[in-house]
Structures are given as structure tokens and as C-alpha cells.
Amino acid sequence: MNEPNRNFFWIFFLILGIFWLQSVWFGSRTVQQIPYSQYESLVKQGDVQNLIVTENHIRGEFKQPQNGFKSFVTNRVEPELAKELSGAGVTYRREIENTFFRDLLSWVVPALIFVAVFLYFSRKFAEKGGMSGLMSVGKSGARLYAETGVKVSFGDVAGVEEAKAELYEVVQFLKSPQEFGRLGARMPKGILLVGPPGTGKTLLAKAVAGEAQVPFYSITGSEFVEMFVGVGAARVRDLFEQARKNAPCIIFIDELDALGKVRGVAGSFGGHDEKEQTLNQLLAELDGFDSRSGVVILAATNRPEVLDPALLRAGRFDRQVLVDRPDRTGREQILRVHLKKIKADEALNVEHLAHLTSGFTGADIANLINEAAMVATRRKAETVNEKDFVAAIERIVAGLEKKSRLLNEKEKAIVAHHEMGHAIMACLFPGVDKVQKISIIPRGLGALGYTMQRPTEDRYLMTRPELLDKICVLLGGRVAEELIFGEVSTGASDDLVRVTNIAEALVTRYGMSEVLGNIVFEQPTGNFLEVPGAGYRSRTYSEKSATEIDQEIRQIVAACALRTRESLAANLSILKKGAAQLLEKETLSEPEIELLMRDLVVKNAAPQRERDLSV
């Protein structure tokens, strides 16, 4: 509660107290309180006059002052009771309960609660963006960073060189807009940064502001829409009005998909009209926006497929910049940027770490370096070395070690042969990711063991034989259990899910079926993010085709299972030897794995169907 409101309450209660004291003090000095029995005696004697009778009291005056009082007051008593008490010669009076404070609280307390609630919400709204009170609910609430407030530059952003080159034009425009107008060119009104989470979209936007040394307005799409109708549109207007006053500047809207979803989609419920109204206002502001005003609009999203087409047309967000996962060179650059923040070992091989972190985003790499530093801290080391990074990668990829999860001897044996089956199949095929470590120490939520494979290079395409090899590697654990123990366990459930997904993709998405031919049976739905089970659910085929697809998937998996069984049977001695070493050591490193796999026998290089077709 601010100072004026606090003073108001003090003054209010002070005035109320003064009136109450006056009524109690001065009233008691001029009026005598007498018993009802005395009042009856005075009436019989004719010593009272000017009576005022109310429901509970009788007020009057003495004809002759008594004890210095001219007036009196008494509480009324029921006539029958008064007559009975008078007959008994008893002095009596009636006490009236004082309800002043109760009556006062009955209306003061609710009023105070209402005022307190009002002031609480008013203060909450005031805290948002430095605004003052509920009357400022239509303010945008964007966080403003002054010209020198953004400490990020392009030197702090690595691994996204193409995106940096695109955005460098924005910096040049903000610094010297006349250069772009020399030949009649204009800067795009809006630039949309698109990419998976953690790739550095927000960091890039801050770097643009830091390089250009201009004010930077930052707000998320969800901050525009509130419970009050019309608030979102008002905040959009206020944001652009502030930006025009402080031009040149940058407006950055993070998570644009929260604000710019396609309008009129069936199934949208509460707040739908409010969101559409807010989006319409944003579209109107972009239309009336002059690209020469010195205000650049940047936005970021990882779900461009849900954005309204009107938002992406030319003249609004007319340039899209892809901020993708970094490649090996990009990961190496990101590692070098973040390694400056820790005490790394001078002998650390950054290039090797870049190979180990395939698929990592910039945020993942930053988290990896922090985890590695924590691992080194726990072992009381002076610097962070490569072993710390490997341990951190295992923790991130496979989960935390669960040494307290004790397995019995049979379960340990099953897990050891299961993981060794994966490792043998992975080492048989040159195109499969290299095995770096095998462990039977439980990790994460449900993994009782793991075979760590990391790619040696970035891959963007996979051939049909490589996908079939991958299925064989995944089936290696289940087939090894069956070969050694004559039965299977539930440990391969996750492997079988991945096997089914790959086989289904071969048939329905990639047109790699030898029976059904070059036909795609599931159309992509356009999802940018790779969500498991989503993105390819538009079915466009008959029940007969569905039956043929199921048969082809079963045939592919069966052929790969047979190939896996033959390969493991040919290397049964290595399977048993490797499992025994795992049971003894619990973990096998890459050199130990290479030594173990020297005498592998390559058996049946192609699945059964391919061999039949080649005859």
C-alpha cells in the first residue's frame, strides 16, 4: 500500500474515534443514568417532565436538579415485570447491550476488505511493467532496455552464422537507414526467427539491439491476452506507440504463436474472441507501420505452422530466418564461447566434444558445460577435463545413475546380455553410430542399462539399408535374451516401439517398401517440431492398403529379426564374453569395446527378402 492510501486510513479512523469519544464523554457528563425503579418513584412523586420514550430507553428532565444533573435516562423494563418487582420492593434496572462496535464492524469490515482487495489488485497491476493501478491495464508491459542496457553482441552468439548474416542487415539499417534508401530499397517490416527451442532466437534478437545500440522492447505473446476483453488490443496499440516515440528501436515479441494462431479454428474455447481481436490489432499496426520509421519488429516462434497466414504475408513478417540446431562446426564455436566461463583443462579436445554433442542445441551445450563444471567440482578438481564432459553427457542423455536400484543376479545377467546384443549389432554395421560405452548401471526413470552411441558426423539423409541396420541394432537386445535364456523380458519394450516406428516410416512415409512401391500413405501435417506420434497422421488409403501396410511392416521386422539372430548366433562367444565382462565391471569403455569386438564375424549383410530378390 502506498503512502497516500495509508494516510487516508489513519485520518479516517482518527476522525471516527474523535466523534465516538465526544459522544461518550460529553454525553455522560450531562445525563444521569438512573434505575427504572427510581424512575417509577419519581413519576409517582411528579418530579419528572419532558419525557422522551423510545423502544429501549426513557429520557427526561428533573423538575428540580438532583446531584447536579438536569436530565436522566433509564432503560425500559416490561410492565408486568416492573409491577412484580415493585410489589416485592426490589430496586431494579435494565441493562442494554452496547452494540456500537458490533454495528460499526458490520459495515466497516466489509468496506475495508473491499478496499484492501481493490488496492491489492491495483498494486499487482502497478508492478507489471512499472505501471500504476488498474487504470493502466491497457499498457503493454513490455520491458524496455536502454541503448546501453543490452550487453549482448554478435560475438556472444555462435553456431548460427547464416542467421547472424541475415540479421546483420538489420543492424546496418538501424545505424544508417539512408544507405538502404539510396537505391529505393526498404527493410522488411517484420523478421520472424523460426527454430527449435534452445537454438538462440531470443539471444539473437538481443544481439541485434546490442550491436545497433538502440532501445530494445521485449515482450512475450502471452502477455498481450488477459481476462479482460479488449486489453490485448490496447496493449498492442500502446507498445507500438511507445516504440514510435523512441525510434530507432527494436520490438521483440517472443513466443509469437501464443498471440498469432490461425483465426477461426474449430475447437477454440475461452478467450477466442479476445485473441482474435488482439491479433487483428497487431495486423492493423503492421499495416500502418512505416519501414522508414526506424522501428524494427523481431519475433520468435518454434511453431510457425500454427501462425495465421495473414501474419506471414509480404509487408508484415515478410522475412523468415531459420535458427536451426548447429552443425559440428557450430557446436565447436558454441563450446568455445561457453568454455570461457569455466576453468577448462588446457588439453581439452573441443573438436572431439563437438562430435560427442551431435543434435545438441546452444542451450543444451550451455547446460552441458555447467553440468561438467559441477562434476569437476564434486571430485574437488582444479580444472574441468574431458572425462567430466563425458560424465555430463551421460547424465543428460541417459539420466542420473541409480546405484541404489539393486537388481538380482538373474536381472543383471539379462540386462548384460541385452546391452551386449545391441553393441555387437552396432559394431557389425559401418553406417551405424559408433558405440562409446556400455553399462548395466540403472539410469533415469526406467533404464536398467544402456549402450551409448554417438554419431561421428552430422547426417541429413539415411538410405534404406541404413534404416534396416538400425532396426537390427534395436532388435539386438531382445534377440540376445532369447538366444541365451530361451525367453524374453519386458526390457525391450522401448526398443520395439522404435523398431515399429522405423518400419512404419519405411513403408508409409519414405516409399521404401519393395511390395507397395514408391507411394506415400501418410501425408505430413506440417508440424515444425518433431513431436513423437505427430506430424504424419493424415490417412489417405483404403482398408485393403492398410492390411498390406501391416503385412509389409511385419515382413520387414521379421526379416531384420532373422538377420539379427543369425549375426548374434555367429558371434555367440563374443556375446557371452562381453556379458561376463559387464557383470564383472558394470561398465565397458570404448577401448575395451574395440578390443572385445576385434574378432566379430559378419553374417548375412542384407535382410532375407533382399537376398531372395538378388537371386
Swiss-Prot record:
It is an enzyme of class 3 (hydrolase). One of its GO terms (molecular function) is ATP hydrolysis activity. It is found in: Cell inner membrane. Residues 29-99 are periplasmic. It is a multi-pass membrane protein. ATP binds at residues 195-202. Signal peptide: none annotated. It holds the Pfam family Peptidase_M41. CDD domains: RecA-like_FtsH. The keyword Membrane applies. Residues 1-7, 121-615 are cytoplasmic. Its EC number is 3.4.24.-. Zn(2+) binds at residues 418, 422, 495. Its cofactor is Zn(2+). The keyword Transmembrane helix applies. GO terms for cellular component: plasma membrane. GO terms for biological process: protein catabolic process; proteolysis. Binds 1 zinc ion per subunit. Gene3D superfamilies: 1.10.8.60, 3.30.720.210, P-loop containing nucleotide triphosphate hydrolases, Peptidase M41. Keywords: ATP-binding, Cell inner membrane, Cell membrane, Hydrolase, Membrane, Metal-binding, Metalloprotease, Nucleotide-binding, Protease, Transmembrane, Transmembrane helix, Zinc. InterPro entries: AAA+_ATPase (IPR003593), AAA_lid_3 (IPR041569), ATP-dep_Zn_Metalloprotease (IPR050928), ATPase_AAA_core (IPR003959), ATPase_AAA_CS (IPR003960), FtsH (IPR005936), P-loop_NTPase (IPR027417), Pept_M41_FtsH_extracell (IPR011546). PANTHER family: AFG3 LIKE MATRIX AAA PEPTIDASE SUBUNIT 2, ISOFORM A (PTHR43655:SF2), ATP-DEPENDENT PROTEASE (PTHR43655). NCBIfam families: FtsH_fam. In the central section; belongs to the AAA ATPase family. Homohexamer. This is ATP-dependent zinc metalloprotease FtsH 2. It comes from Bdellovibrio bacteriovorus (strain ATCC 15356 / DSM 50701 / NCIMB 9529 / HD100). The lineage of its organism: Bacteria, Pseudomonadati, Bdellovibrionota, Bdellovibrionia, Bdellovibrionales. The gene is ftsH2.
